[in-house]
């Protein structure tokens, strides 16, 4: 399970700066949920291969006596939901009473806490951080978030307990070598043997992890119970490691699924709450742990900023996507037409996703969701050989040549699969990293159409070979050597 790191501390100690540094954003608004999360901000981060969710809890002010009151509510909830707490202090301002109050609260929580002294640039970090050892939170990690100094080492120290639990990345160096060989053979007109990468792997033998996410009161629990109440075989309820999320194995149409319910499955007679229980942390973790995300949108409320924030997080995580527009029943034809126009206008950036119009309460359209879920999963895990990807790349190049870069035509050599879920196509060539964004989008869309990929984003990565002449001087020809000798002798005579 992807860990959650919460940033806590007084105002103006640099939490937002560190948040922006970790999430590679500028505005610290990766996923902001007004009215529900107050001043908490959420983002997905990756540092040196370590993936995690980072939460900026906002400034916590107050004294040692009143810190419990100041930390109540949303900020306290963020700390409780986090796996790791980074307690940030200002090295330039020194130890403050509010720091002592926050530290006392954190010590009582028995949470993995790291004391981080920010703004140590331009000063002696040992002298500036000496007073903070009195907080009783162990070693003080000195960083300069604005310049990124010490941030990578901090994350490596924080994530050390999770390194053994992380799944090893799949190395494709052997496939890259094979891809280069067969691309060369094909260029010479030789027959390329049929490929079947990873013969032993059949994604259909694995259950599909389906996360149902959405804003409160859009009908997630109603939809979950409708799914479980129709032609289902529930084997058992297995509480997941995600806080309060429930993992429910089920079978539908001879296909196994694991339903990840972030709202909690309740019996039909107990769905009486007007607003469903909602936790941003649970939602983001469920997205990361899923294969396919089913995003539920309220047709009567339209597309909100919260929906767009969730969509952005889903895209960044690379998960497959199916969109369900709920509460479609009872709407007039005019209202439905307006909703469809709005979807076309605001959801153009996820045109690969199937959109279904359903009524979770009455069950209309619910059965068709699983066809799109299965399609999205199959597309995201489909194995494609190097020769096919290279041929598609060549056809795209023939239809629309790459642009000139510094007077030279970009050369695309070969393509191969670089990963799945989401599908990744790696293109090798010369100057490929200088391709314009528009041409990269053209290649992505061309691969999507050619491979008939639906329901999942597709990513294109570019790799350049090293220039064998980089840093080397061309040897002089014999004629150039004679000219050089004549020039040198002429210069000596002139002296």
UniProtKB/Swiss-Prot annotation:
Residues 3-166, 208-381 form the EngA-type G domain. GTP 2 binds at residues 214-221, 261-265, 326-329. One of its GO terms (molecular function) is ribosome binding. It comes from the Bacteria. Residues 382-466 form the KH-like domain. InterPro entries: G_ENGA, GTP-bd, GTPase_Der, KH_dom-like, KH_dom-like_a/b, P-loop_NTPase, Small_GTP-bd. GTP 1 binds at residues 9-16, 56-60, 118-121. CDD domains: EngA1, EngA2. GO terms for biological process: ribosome biogenesis. Pfam families: KH_dom-like, MMR_HSR1. Keywords: GTP-binding, Nucleotide-binding, Repeat, Ribosome biogenesis. PROSITE patterns: G_ENGA. GTPase that plays an essential role in the late steps of ribosome biogenesis. Associates with the 50S ribosomal subunit. Belongs to the TRAFAC class TrmE-Era-EngA-EngB-Septin-like GTPase superfamily. EngA (Der) GTPase family. This is GTPase Der. It comes from Yersinia pestis. The lineage of its organism: Bacteria, Pseudomonadati, Pseudomonadota, Gammaproteobacteria, Enterobacterales. The gene is der.
């Amino acid at each position: 399970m992807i860990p959650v790191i919460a940033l806590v501390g007084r105002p103006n100690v640099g939490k937002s700066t560190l948040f922006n540094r970790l999430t590679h954003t500028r505005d610290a608004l990766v996923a902001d949920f007004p009215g529900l999360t107050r001043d908490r901000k959420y983002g997905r981060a990756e540092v040196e291969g370590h993936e995690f969710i980072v939460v900026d809890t906002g400034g916590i002010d107050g004294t040692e006596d009143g810190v419990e009151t100041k930390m109540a509510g949303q900020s306290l909830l963020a700390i409780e939901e986090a796996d790791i707490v980074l307690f940030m202090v200002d090295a330039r301002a020194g130890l403050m009473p509010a720091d002592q109050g926050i530290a006392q609260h954190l010590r009582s929580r028995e949470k993995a806490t790291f004391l981080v002294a920010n703004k140590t640039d331009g000063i002696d970090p040992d002298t500036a951080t000496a007073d903070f050892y009195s907080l009783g939170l162990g070693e003080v990690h000195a960083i300069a978030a604005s310049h990124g100094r010490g941030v990578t080492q901090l994350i490596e120290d924080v994530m050390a307990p999770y390194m053994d639990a992380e799944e090893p990345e799949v190395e494709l160096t052997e496939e890259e070598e094979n891809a280069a060989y067969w691309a060369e053979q094909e260029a010479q007109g030789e027959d390329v043997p049929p490929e079947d990468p990873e013969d032993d792997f059949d994604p259909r033998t694995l259950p599909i992890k389906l996360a149902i996410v959405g804003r409160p009161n859009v009908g997630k629990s109603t939809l979950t119970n409708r799914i479980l109440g129709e032609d289902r075989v529930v084997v058992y309820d297995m509480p997941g490691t995600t806080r309060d999320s429930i993992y429910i194995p089920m079978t539908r149409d001879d296909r196994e699924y694991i339903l990840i319910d972030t709202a909690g499955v309740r019996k039909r007679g107990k769905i009486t709450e007007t607003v469903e229980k909602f936790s941003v942390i649970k939602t983001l973790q469920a997205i990361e742990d899923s294969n396919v995300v089913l995003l539920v949108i309220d047709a009567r409320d339209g597309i909100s900023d919260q929906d767009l924030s969730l969509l952005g997080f889903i895209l960044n995580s690379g998960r497959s996507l199916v969109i369900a527009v709920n509460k479609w029943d009872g709407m007039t034809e005019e209202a439905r037409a307006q909703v469809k126009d709005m979807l076309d206008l605001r959801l153009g950036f996820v045109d690969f996703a199937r959109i279904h119009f359903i009524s979770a309460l009455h069950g209309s359209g619910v059965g068709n969701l699983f066809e799109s879920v299965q399609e999205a999963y199959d597309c995201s895990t489909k194995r494609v050989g190097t020769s096919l990807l290279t041929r598609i790349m060549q056809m795209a190049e023939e239809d629309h040549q790459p642009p000139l870069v510094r007077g030279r035509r970009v050369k695309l050599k070969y393509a191969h699969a670089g990963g799945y879920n989401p599908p990744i196509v790696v293109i090798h060539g010369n100057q490929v990293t200088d391709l314009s964004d528009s041409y990269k989008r053209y290649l992505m869309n061309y691969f999507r159409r050619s491979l008939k990929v639906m329901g999942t984003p597709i990513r294109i990565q570019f790799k350049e070979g090293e220039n064998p002449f980089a840093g080397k001087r061309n040897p002089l020809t014999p004629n150039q050597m004679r000219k050089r000798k004549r020039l040198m002798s002429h210069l000596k005579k002139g002296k």
